[in-house]
């Protein structure tokens, strides 16, 4: 999507006009204009010259946004320059409005004294009012220039309504002044007094001043809606210390190149994304992720621009600079989202497109109607002017975008990034949340969970033997034991004669004693295991854990259980989702036994096990038949499923925010951000409904009241000045209501409402249904040597790499691989594929 700056827009009608003319340019497939940020996003093959020309022809100005230095210049582009200008206009207008109101209303209504030269000087009074009004009209000439220019281009906007209303009041008052002068010359005092009461100079001036007041309040409030985006842009560091030719030098952060070596002292901001070469420190990443707890960084870890080095000295290499940094990607994502439209905005857009012409028509009908009813020209004109100045298309046009902008800002502060307004709206409507297990519900890294020493063996003795043996292994489960040993500060000699028996276990010698470790089958070859120990191992396996047995000189030392543990916040997050009326499903490639154990611990409604990475998309498609689906994954192998879902949520993106497949990017690896994102979406949607209700209600009530429809019944009539006051406050109320979203606590469950749903989800075997569609032929392989889920994954990946294999269901517990074939394949090929991975195939049928 190519981005443009658009200037000259003053209201929702202008926005609708720009969208309409650009959408008609050949080659444009979609266009979205934001009145808040004065920007436009265009997709298609049309040239920028054609697009700019179309905007210019419509009476506005457009230019292609400069891509360079977007983060540093963006804050300046969003700076509120409009409010100071409007405030100056307002103050000067008030200075001249006060004497005008004194002359027109103070003397006539409350008999306040007049200057001597105006006593009994009716013409002088009229000329003074005309002079003050002209000055105020000149001060606020922008309304007339914009309004009548738009009218000439057949695209009337809010300024057109104001300009027409003020011009009508001023024009009729000027006519009355000249008519009064003629009457005074003729000595007709009665007619003079009659025309004196037909002056509406103060109405014209008051309309312009009150609308300027409203515009000032609106501009100030709109400026606040972009505070979050501006604060992000202001985070961009200005300077960097780099090492070039062996010399340290200070340069602009914009000049840092990929591969440069840069230094960061304690208390300084990191200028660009990089990788730590030397040093250790705690980094405050709150600005990017919303995480208040500093993150420890050491050699080999990634660091991001705009995060703060809190303690140690760091030497880093620049890996992503300029627009490629994490900060720039976040800014781009939030900006792009602000330039898109939510589906709910379509109603307001349609109304805004015809609103002003409709109001002008109603005003004309009102004037003619009252004249036909026998009322005076002044009375009829006052009703028509009231209709013009009370009508407000801006309230309609701002109802959705201001809420979207503020909502996006709240999300960004909390590390929740919505790519489009559509995703921000749709997230709150989901019925089903599908969670990928690994890296989403769990940490994605095996950890030691249980230590069960054998009788007479201390926990320390078991751990030291396991640590010494596993230090030599490259297996993922071995790494879990080694990490645990490091945490306990174990220092043991390296084993001799180390040997890894693929798929079974490990052997080695330490102090002339033989150490063995591995699965039950491997250990049982050399010693007998009691039934009690076997039952303990079975219980661990039932809980989704992998039991590792260790022995010394054929004497059992005990069991260490390893598992990909559930994140601390996962059960609570899932509980919150269910409390919101959302059905929670877990997808995993694990066997059903392990999957159910994890699912029960996490508290999900359903578990769909044995789902291949490329099978997730079909599962999401099937779930989509039952309701709106959000898919949550870590982005690894999840792209098709994230794309298929109504809302794709990438969790734990960290520095990699450019997740093309996802609609929502969560910067942290916390599942709690999923209900928070849905809560934010619901809050924004509720706020939009409030804004739209107010905008429609205001115009539905205000226009008939201004037209005088209640005069015959209740005698209520609206002075044009009060109509202008109401108009000036309407947009301000909408924007202020949207700003309340800044007070929304997206972590609190107090205001959660359970979504009403009648979805009957029978999902346990939904993956099997999908698989049966391609089930031409299966073969069952008996395999020895598999001892954990990682072994399963290795065999599965190897088999599924064969072009003839559609899918493979592998179980280390059963020692089998059920292979679904798309076409015939020789058993020898299947056997060799598995044995090349150091496992033994004992049969195929």
Describe these PLM feature segments.
Residues 1-124, 222, 231, 247-248, ...:
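Flexible metal-binding regulatory segments at protein termini and peripheral loops
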Residues 16, 430, 510-512, 544-546, ...:
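Conserved ATP-binding TGD loop and adjacent catalytic N/P-domain core of P-type ATPases
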Residues 26-49, 198-199, 230-324, 422-466, ...:
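Conserved cytosolic catalytic loops of P-type ATPases
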Residues 74, 180, 189-190, 205-266, ...:
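Juxtamembrane coupling segments of multi-pass membrane pumps/enzymes
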Residues 85-239, 350, 715-720, 726, ...:
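Transmembrane helix-loop-helix hairpins at the membrane interface
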Residues 88, 307, 428-435, 441-474, ...:
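ATP-driven catalytic headpiece of P-type ATPases
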Residues 109-123, 152, 156, 171, ...:
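Membrane-embedded alpha-helical bundles of multi-pass transporters
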Residues 288, 347, 382, 395-469, ...:
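Conserved catalytic phosphorylation-site environment of P-type ATPases
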């Amino acid at each position: 999507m190519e981005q443009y700056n658009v200037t000259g827009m003053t209201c929702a009608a202008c926005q609708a006009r720009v969208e309409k003319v650009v959408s008609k340019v050949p080659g444009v497939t979609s266009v979205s204009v934001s009145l808040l940020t004065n920007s436009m996003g265009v997709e298609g093959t049309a040239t920028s010259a054609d697009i700019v020309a179309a905007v210019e022809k419509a009476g506005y100005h457009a230019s292609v946004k400069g891509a360079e230095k977007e983060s540093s210049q963006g804050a300046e582009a969003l700076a509120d320059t409009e409010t100071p200008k409007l405030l100056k206009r307002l103050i000067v207008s008030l200075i001249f409005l006060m004497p005008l109101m004194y002359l027109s209303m103070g003397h006539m209504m409350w008999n306040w004294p007049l200057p001597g030269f105006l006593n009994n000087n009716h013409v002088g009074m009229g000329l003074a009012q005309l002079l003050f009004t002209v000055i105020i009209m000149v001060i606020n000439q922008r309304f007339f220039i914009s309004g009548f220019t738009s009218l000439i281009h057949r695209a009337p906007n809010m300024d057109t309504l104001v300009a027409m209303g003020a011009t009508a009041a001023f024009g009729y008052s000027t006519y009355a002044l000249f008519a009064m002068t003629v009457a005074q010359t003729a000595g007709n005092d009665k007619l003079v007094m009659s025309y004196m009461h037909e002056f509406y100079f103060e109405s014209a001036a008051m309309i312009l001043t009150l609308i300027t007041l409203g515009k000032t309040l609106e501009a100030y409030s709109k400026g606040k809606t972009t505070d979050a985006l501006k604060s992000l842009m202001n985070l961009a560091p200005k300077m960097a210390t780099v090492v070039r030719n062996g010399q340290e030098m200070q340069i602009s952060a914009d000049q840092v190149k990929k591969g440069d070596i840069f230094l960061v002292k304690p208390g300084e901001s990191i200028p660009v994304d990089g990788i730590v070469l030397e040093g250790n420190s705690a980094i405050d990443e709150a600005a990017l992720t919303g995480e208040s707890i500093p993150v420890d960084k050491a050699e080999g870890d990634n660091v991001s621009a705009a995060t703060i080095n809190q303690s140690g000295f760091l030497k880093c290499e620049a890996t992503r600079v300029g627009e490629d940094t994490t900060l720039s990607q976040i800014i781009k994502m939030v900006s792009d989202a602000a330039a898109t439209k939510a589906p709910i905005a379509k109603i307001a857009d349609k109304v805004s497109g015809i609103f002003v012409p409709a109001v002008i028509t109603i005003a004309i009908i009102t004037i003619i109607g009252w004249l036909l009813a026998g009322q005076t020209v002044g009375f009829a004109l006052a009703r028509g002017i009231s209709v013009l100045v009370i009508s407000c298309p801006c309230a309609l046009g701002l109802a959705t975008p201001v809420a979207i902008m503020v909502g996006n800002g709240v999300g960004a502060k909390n590390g929740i990034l919505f790519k489009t307004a559509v995703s921000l709206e749709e997230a709150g409507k989901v019925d089903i949340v599908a969670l990928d297990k690994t890296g989403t519900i769990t940490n994605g890294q095996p950890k030691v969970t249980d230590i069960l020493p054998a009788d007479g063996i201390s926990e320390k003795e078991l751990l030291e033997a396991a640590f010494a043996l596993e230090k030599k292994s490259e297996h993922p489960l071995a790494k879990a034991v080694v990490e645990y040993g490091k945490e306990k500060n174990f220092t043991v000699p390296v084993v001799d004669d180390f040997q890894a028996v693929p798929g079974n276990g490990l052997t080695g010698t330490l102090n002339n004693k033989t150490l063995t470790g591995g699965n039950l089958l491997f250990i049982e070859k050399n010693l007998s295991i009691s039934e009690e120990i076997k039952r303990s191992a079975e219980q661990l396996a039932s809980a989704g854990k992998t039991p590792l047995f260790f022995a010394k000189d054929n004497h059992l030392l005990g069991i260490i259980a390893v598992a990909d543990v559930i994140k601390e916040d996962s059960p609570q997050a899932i509980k919150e989702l269910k409390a919101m009326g959302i059905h929670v499903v877990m997808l995993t490639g694990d066997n059903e036994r392990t999957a159910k154990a994890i699912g029960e611990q996490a508290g999900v409604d359903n578990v769909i096990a044995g789902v291949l990475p490329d099978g997730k998309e079909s599962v999401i498609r099937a779930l989509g038949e039952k309701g709106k689906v959000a898919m949550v994954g870590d982005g690894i192998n999840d792209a098709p499923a994230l794309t298929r879902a109504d809302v794709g949520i990438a969790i734990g993106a960290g520095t990699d925010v450019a997740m093309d497949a996802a609609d929502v990017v969560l910067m942290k690896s916390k599942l709690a951000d999923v209900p928070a994102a849905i809560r934010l979406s619901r809050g924004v949607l509720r706020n939009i409904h409030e804004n739209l209700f107010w905008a429609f209600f205001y115009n539905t009530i205000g226009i008939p009241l201004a037209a005088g429809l209640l005069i015959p019944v209740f005698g209520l009539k609206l002075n044009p000045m009060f109509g202008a006051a109401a108009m000036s406050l309407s947009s301000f109320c909408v924007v202020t209501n949207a700003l309340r979203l800044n007070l929304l606590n997206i972590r609190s469950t107090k205001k959660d409402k359970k979504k009403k749903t009648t979805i009957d989800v029978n999902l346990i075997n939904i993956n099997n249904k999908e698989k049966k569609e391609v089930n031409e032929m299966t073969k069952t392989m008996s395999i020895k040597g598999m001892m954990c889920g990682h072994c399963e994954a290795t065999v599965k990946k190897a088999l599924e790499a064969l072009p003839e294999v559609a899918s493979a269901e592998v179980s280390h517990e059963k020692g089998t691989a059920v292979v679904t074939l798309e076409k015939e394949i020789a058993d020898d090929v299947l056997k060799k594929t598995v044995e090349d991975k150091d496992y033994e195939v004992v049969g195929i049928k």
